[in-house]
Every structure is written in structure tokens, then in C-alpha cells.
């Protein structure tokens, strides 16, 4: 009976997620919104109001079903972050470097700082979880304002047929820089929460790190030490492991080899005392752009040896993860409309103005800067990962968890609608970068030199 009950719950979650994703994809909106709304319909917000007995029977709080769904939720989270790492492959914006630099600096530093300032100026203690503190809450708030979604925005641009444009190169290059830096900040935040509770594990526990100051220092350095070697030589290491003679798994089941890589990297991250999502991120970076993975971005194509894992992840694990995120939302009890409205307005305004300012300083015109700003506002998967990990660590409570998830959904939908409107009108998303005066003078001098 327990197995039958679990299978019924999985069928309901998977079916609701895919139906919701299909409907939103049909209206040219990010499928992730539909997948979460599918879970929302099965949770206390909808089904719990219409038929509370059926909702409690389908998703009980005790027994084997919640344990298995919790495990699938965590695996889906790790594989989603793995795919995010796969998205961080080299779409190099060589001719748009000035825009990338200005937008990355202005669009990350300013929103994060403004988020910190508001979080310290406004009393947000009512949004802290059992292990949260004013400092960790402020860091989560700042990250929520500054974060950008690589998977969602890349999927939007693929669907619109603009993935090979200068606009896509700018947005994705900036998003990669932002997300990597914000993942490091997330490691510091979770480490501070560990120090507050004394529930450290791995190397920090062996070293006896138990003060906030020691935790901040350790969790700033440890993720960088863990990330840098794999970001620098990870692809080469992956190719060597995949092509090694002793690697019998790659030839027989490439998806199994990649899943083993993800889990091994997650265990290594846990051994260092940092959240396993960093191991999944590094596994994705190692596997991205390798000789066996093909050159096309993940959502577009399906080529390469890792296609089977990607298809299984997007068909099962990620929809179940997003559906459970929706299932855990209780809008009737944990949505504060006043807080969410000003939080949404503040986050979107600060992020948009900061990105717009950076793009304008780089030489983009008003419309191009606005397009980049709205695209960079899509928080999507990373915003939901931030909500999930900080809520699981006890840094935030259900009210802020709900607000962060809704912020990710609304901004992703808005970015998709805006960019779709621009493309359908045949308007340019960006203008070519204008050469600097020095570069123009050098070009004119070169033209005057006789052949």
C-alpha cells in the first residue's frame, strides 16, 4: 500500500508539472512557471482549500511518502544546479566586452548593496527562520535582489531564436559572472547559519570552527578553493576521465557516468562543509563544453553524450522538484501581499536601473539598455534555489520563502513577455558597441597609412 500511495503521489506531481509546463510553453511563457503552478494546485493553496481531506491523504506529513518525495526534491535540486553549470559554457562575448564589464559591475554590486541597505534599515526579523540572524537575512535579501537566472533566460532566447545574437552573449556572460559570485555569498550565508546552530559538518567540524568570524573566513575561502581548480581545468579533467581506458561506465552508460560525477562532487563539497549544490555546480562546469558534449547549449539541443541525463533530468527530476516547490507554497497562510508588492517593486526597480545604467555607460542606447535590464531581471531557477537552500538551512521562514519563489516566477514571466514582444515587432535587442574615441583615432590613422 505504501508503494502504491507513493506512486499515486508521483503520478499526480509529474502529471500536474508537465501539464502546467505544456500550457505555459504553448503561450510562449517559461515552462517552469507552469510546473510550479501545477504543484501549487495540488498543495494547500488550491486542493487543500477545495478538498483538504484528499490533499492530506495524497501528500501526508508522515510515513514513507514524504521521505521519498524529499529525497527526489533534493536530487532534482542538485541536477537543476548541474544543468545550470552546464549552461555556463563559453559563449564568449569578445566584441561586447565593454558592455559585459559595465553591466556585470553595475548590475551586481548596486542591487546587492541596496538590498543589504534596505534589509538593515527595515525590520525584517519577522522573516527570519529558526537559524537566521539579521546578517544572514540581509545577505539572502541582497542576493534575491541581485540574482539572475541562466537557465530561464537562455531558454527564453532559444525559443525566440536570438540565442546566437550579441544580446544573448551579453546577457549570458553577465549572468555567469553574477551567479558564480552569488553562489560564493550563499556559501558564506549558509556557513554563518551553521556556526549559529553549531551544526557544522565535514572539515569545519574537524577544525573546530564554531565562531561567526571563523565561519565567514572559512566559507569565503573554501568555496573559492573548491571552485577555482574545476573552473580552470575542469573540462580537461572531465575529458580525460571520460576517455580513460579504465572508465567502463562512459562507454556503456554516459548518463550514469555524469550522475556519478555529480554525486561525487556533491560528497566532496559536503566533506569541505559547504552545501552540496556547489558540488553539482562544479560538476556541470566540468562537463560543459567538453569534447563529448557538443557545442550547442543544453536547452537547444540534445547533442553530446550527456543528452540522456539531460532529458531524464528535464523529464522527471526537475519537474518533480518544481512541483514540490509549488506544493510547499501555502499562499493563504504565508503570503503577505503588502510585503510582496513592495519587495517585487523594489527588487525589479533596483535591478533594472542598475543594469540599465551599466549598459548606458557602455554605449548602449535607451531601448537596448532597457532590453538587457529586463532580461537580467529574470530570477527563475537560481532564485528558487536560493529560496530552497536558505529555507532548508533555517535562514528564512515560509513567508520569505513564498515571496522569493513568487518573485522568481513573476520576473521570469515578465522577461519572457517583454522580449517576445520586442522580437515579434522586429525591433533590435541591442546595438553594436561604438568604438572608443582612442580606438576610432587608431583606426583612422591606420587608414591614412598607404599600402
Regions found by a protein language model. Name each.
Residues 1-13, 64-81, 133-148, 215-227, ...:
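Structural signature of hydrophobic alpha-helical transmembrane segments
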Residues 13-22, 40, 44, 48-49, ...:
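Transmembrane alpha-helical segments of multi-pass membrane transport proteins and ion-pumping complexes
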Residues 15-26, 49, 90-160, 325-332, ...:
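Transmembrane alpha-helices that form the ion-translocation and gating core
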Residues 35-47, 102-116, 173-187, 247-266, ...:
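Small-residue-rich segments of transmembrane alpha-helices in multi-pass membrane proteins
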Residues 42-99, 239-343:
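Membrane-interface junctions of multi-pass transporters
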Residues 52-64, 122-132, 195-214, 243, ...:
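Membrane-interface helix termini and inter-helical loops of multi-pass transporters
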Residues 120-125, 189, 193-197, 214-240, ...:
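Juxtamembrane and boundary regions of transmembrane helices in multi-pass small-molecule transporters
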Residues 199-211, 235-257, 291-306, 424-451:
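Intrinsically disordered, low-complexity non-transmembrane regions of multi-pass membrane transporters
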